[in-house]
Amino acid sequence: MKKIGFIIINYNDYKTTKKLVDNIKDYKVINEIVVVDNKSTDKSVLELKKINNITLIANEENYGFAKAINIGCKYLIDKYKDCYIFVSNSDIRIEEENDLKELVKTFKVKDIALVGPVIKEPDGVVRGWKLTSVNEDILMNIPLINRIYRNKLLNYKDSYYKTLLSYVDMVKGCFFLIDSKALEKINYLDENTFLYYEENILAKKLKVKKYKTVINNKVTIYHDHAKTISKNVNNINRYKITKESFMYYEKNYNDANSLQIFILKILNNINLIVKKIRKK
C-alpha cells in the first residue's frame, strides 16, 4: 500500500490550520501531515511548532500557492518515493476518515492521476469544471454578457454527476488528492503563478500526459471559501493577482495569440474599472 501524505498550506492563519490538524490527526489513513508555512507575518510558525505529530516546513519567503505545494510534495516524495498526496487549504473540514479512504480507493481505476471530492461551500456546491478555449475565455470576460456564457461553458450539467465517478477537466484547488508519480511526470505545478489558476495549469499538464481527473461523488468536503485569502488580500488586489495568473495561463498553456492577448488585456482593464466604481 502506498504511503499517504496530507499537505496543508498556511499563511497568517494558524488557528484555522490547527483546527484542520485537530480534525485529521487521528486518521490512520494518513501517514504524515505536512504544514507548509508561506512566510507568515503573524506568529504562525511559533504556534504551529507547538503542534505534535506534524512536519512543519517554514518557507523563507512567501512563494505563493503553487510553489508551496511543490515544496510539500517534494518533501513527501523524497521520503516515501511513491505515494498519494492530499493537498488542502487550511479552511477545510472533513466529516470522517472514511471520506479520505474513499478518495484513495478511486485510484484503483486505471490512468487516474487526480481525484477531487464534492466541495460544499457557504454559497453552494462545487464539483469539476471544463477547460475553455481562449475565445470562450474572452466571452466570459465581456462585461454584462459574461454571466450568460459562464455557466454553460464552464460547468457540467447536474445529471453528469449521477454516477460514482465523473471524469472532469479540472477540480477545485482547495482540496484534492494526487498520485506522486503523475506529479513527477508533469514536473510538478508551475511556480510562475503566485495565486490562482493553479487548477487550470495543473489540468492542462495532466491532459497533455493523458492522465485522467475525476470527481468522486460519494465524498463531500466542506470549505469555508476564501476565508484566508479574504483576510489577507483586498478585493481589488485579489482581482489583479487573479488576472496576472490568468494572462500567464492564456499565454503559456491556452495557446493565445497576440490579438487574443490584446483583447483580454483590454477586458481586464475594463472589468477592473467596473470593480473600482462598484466599490465607491
Each predicted region: which residue ranges?
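Short beta-strand-to-loop acidic/aromatic patch adjacent to the donor-nucleotide binding site
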Residues: 81-93
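Conserved donor NDP-sugar-binding/catalytic core segment of glycosyltransferases
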Residues: 93-130
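Short, well-formed alpha-helical segments that are part of the catalytic scaffolds
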Residues: 13-26
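Active-site-adjacent helix/loop segment of glycosyltransferases
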Residues: 204, 208-280
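Glycine-rich, basic loop-to-helix element that forms the pyrophosphate-binding segment
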Residues: 59-79
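Short, flexible, basic/aromatic active-site loop/helix in glycosyltransferases
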Residues: 134-168
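A conserved acidic beta->alpha catalytic loop
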Residues: 37-46, 61
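A short, conserved alpha-helix in the catalytic core of glycosyltransferases
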Residues: 161, 169-220
